[in-house]
Amino acid sequence: MKYLIDTVILIDHLNGIKKATQWLKKNKDSFISPITRAELLVGAEEKEKHSIKFLLDSFETLSINNEIADLAAELRKKHRLKLPDAFQAAIAIINEVKLVTRNTKDFKREMGFIKIPYKL
């Protein structure tokens, strides 16, 4: 199984959460999205950007296209997701991968495309 890594998992890793680091080590062939890249970089201190880009570049980035944008709009409306979360979900669904997240507020396991690898 391949996975799309949600931003919160990488933030946990960068903050030294061992469960996140262990999960990432076991799933090195996972993907990120342009959403994750932007969210991590916007919150980064200037001195951290190089190491964060190095981490991000270690994953293949799945792109966004019109099919994904259309599905994101549907998911946003149906599940009342924030737009970035709707895009993450749409990218996972279209690419037939699981979205790995710790965000149980917006994503529910029963959505089918979600994997919650650990809890804090």
What are these regions (language model features)?
Residues 9-10, 36, 68, 87-88, ...:
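Alpha-helix capping/helix-boundary segments
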Residues 1-32, 41-57:
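Short, well-structured N-terminal submotif of metal-dependent ribonuclease cores
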Residues 77, 81, 97:
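Short glycine/serine/threonine/alanine-rich loop segments
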